[in-house]
Structures are given as structure tokens and as C-alpha cells.
Amino acid sequence: MSKCSRKKYIKTNLRQMTMDTMESQQDGSVTDSVAENESAHMQNQTGQNSIPTLTQVSVAGSGTGRGSPAVTLVQLPSGQTVHVQGIIQTPQPSVIQSPQIQTVQVATIAETDESAESEGVIDSHKRREILSRRPSYRKILNELSSDVPGVPKIEEEKSEEEGTPPNIATMAVPTSIYQTSTGQYIAIAQGGTIQISNPGSDGVQGLQALTMTNSGAPPPGATIVQYAAQSADGTQQFFVPGSQVVVQDEETELAPSHMAAATGDMPTYQIRAPTTALPQGVVMAASPGSLHSPQQLAEEATRKRELRLMKNREAARECRRKKKEYVKCLENRVAVLENQNKTLIEELKALKDLYCHKAE
């Protein structure tokens, strides 16, 4: 289809639209200046619009009363502007001037699927990066345990393929491994053997066996731990589960005020001077954790409850006593008022009798 035939086809369609519009209008009289201004305004708008596939058709019915043709502005897809005059004139002008402009906009916007696919790829890539940067709970706990002293370190699980370290002798597998605040490692085996390592040793290497025996001299339930290792400051820190522990040092005697720092869920033991006849170099370690056992916590709660109930009973007793005193005071007041009332009644009778005798 050639360019000329396209223009003719568009003009024919526009004339048909103009005829239909003019027939549907009742009162469409406007001045020529208004039509020209509207046409110029539509030209500016069509010049600013950058959509190539946009076609605007403006139909303005204009007439000053007689012989004023309708002006139609057409913008072609190539950017050309065509003015088309209507053939049908307005039959009768109206006093009311109501300009009516009909704008038909046809826009075609093609959206490709490539943008959506690229956004989905970017979102999945960002999600994978966030998940890869997110630290694990074990890593966070290891960092916390390395920064804060006295918190047990969480050892990574070793594979079964790794062999036994050469510095560790053949011994029973320990059930619990703990680390003190000075860097020593303490392992408690199933048979009751305690193994302690020096602060300079690597991991659990260099563990030294400690003999733990029971003795009849200390109080029942206590445990004697004998060890020959000695640290730089002459003290040892270890953990033994139980309520009371007796520690014996073969080389140096522990200070009575020495505190064995505990980590994890193990109780804290405070070394104190023995109260019984124990061998020289043996001191008693009492666990303050036993003071906060569930049984004692329950007893403490029961004691507080009983104390509160006792205070409530005392307050109620005092309230009842004051109420009784108040009632008794009111009863005494009523009795006094009754006596006064009787006295006044007797005086009134006496005065009446006296008045009657005088009247006679």
C-alpha cells in the first residue's frame, strides 16, 4: 500500500468520524480562536510525545453560527501533522458554548520476556550470595568462645579417617573434655580418671593422668584427687562433678582462697581450709552450686511463700483488732447517748409536771 493511498484511506476514515461526531453533538459552537488554540496545543503535545506507534486524532466542533467548518488534527505514525476540515456544518447555533474534544490514543508497547528472565537470574544470584555469606551457628559460637574467657570452645568434629595423635598415649576415651580459664584441658574418663594438659600444649595433646581415689577420712561423699603436675604459678585448676571435692597437691599446697574457674555446665568449686583432720596438703573444695540446687530453690520459694502468708496473717489480725476496738468505742458512745437521752426525758417530764401545777 503506497503512501498516497494510505493518506487517502486515513482522510476518508477521519471524514467519516467527523460526520458521526457532528451528528452526535447537540450544541458545539465555539469561536475560531478557541479551535486554533486547541489545534496548536495538540500540535505541541504531539511534538513532545516520543512513542513511535502513537496515533492521536482530535475532533473539535467549531462554529461561530454559520458556515464554520469543523477542524480535525491528525498525526501520522511518521510524525506528519494533517489538518482536515469537516464537510457537515452545524445546523443551528446555540447560546451555550460547550467545546467537546474527543481524543483517541492508540499505543502499542511490546514487553519482552528477556527483562523478566534477567531479573529472575539476578534475584537468584543475590539469594545465593546472601546464603553463602551467612555464617553458621557453630562458627558464631566458636567466635564467642574465643573472645570471652571462661566459655568452653566448641571443637569441630574430626573425621574418623584421621589417626591418633602421636603425643597421646593409649588410654580410655574421656567422656568430657573441658578447658579452664588458663588454657588447660581437663578430661574426665569413664573410670573416674582425670587427665589434665598444660596451657602450652596443642588441643588435648599432652594430657597428664591424675589418680582419683576415695578416702574414708574426709566427710562422706567427698573425693580425693591426687596429681603431680604443677603449673607456673603453683596452682592447678580442674573440674570434678559432685557436691564436695577434696584436692591434694603432692608438691605445693593450694591457697585456701584459690578459686577454680568452671566453664560450661560444670559447677564452680571454691577451695577452703578443711574442718576435719585431713593429711597435710589436703584442702576441702565446696561447690557453691549445691546452694542453688533445685531442691534448695524450691525450699527457698516455700520459705518466702510462708513468710508472705505469715505477714498477711499478722496484717489481718491487726486489722481485726482495730475493727473490734472501733466497734467497742461505738458501743460505748451509744450507751452514753442512751443515758443522756433517758436523763433528758426525765427532766422533760419533771418540767411538764411543774408547769401543770403552776397553771392550776
Curated annotation (Swiss-Prot):
Region described as Disordered: 20-52
Post-translational changes noted in the entry: Stimulated by phosphorylation. Phosphorylated on Ser-118 by TSSK4 in vitro.
Subcellular location: Nucleus
GO molecular function, a single term: DNA-binding transcription repressor activity, RNA polymerase II-specific
Record key words, sorted: Activator, DNA-binding, Nucleus, Phosphoprotein, Repressor, Transcription, Transcription regulation
Family matches, as Pfam families: bZIP_1, pKID
InterPro entries (UniProt xref): bZIP, bZIP_sf, CREB1-like_pKID, Leuzip_CREB
Boundaries of every bZIP domain copy: 302-360
PROSITE patterns associated with the record: BZIP, BZIP_BASIC, KID
Primary localization: nucleus
Gene3D superfamilies for this protein: 1.20.5.170
Residues modified to Phosphoserine: 118, 145, 287, 290, 293
Region (Basic motif): 303-328
Every KID domain range: 104-163
GO cellular component: ATF4-CREB1 transcription factor complex
Alphabetical GO biological process terms: regulation of transcription by RNA polymerase II
Location of the region described as Leucine-zipper in the Swiss-Prot/TrEMBL record: 330-351
Family indicated by similarity: Belongs to the bZIP family.
Functional note: Transcriptional regulator that binds the cAMP response element (CRE), a sequence present in many viral and cellular promoters. Isoforms are either transcriptional activators or repressors. Isoform Tau is a transcriptional activator. Plays a role in spermatogenesis and is involved in spermatid maturation.
Assembly mode: Binds DNA as a dimer. Interacts with FHL5. Interacts with CDC34. May interact with TSSK4.
Name this protein carries in UniProt: cAMP-responsive element modulator
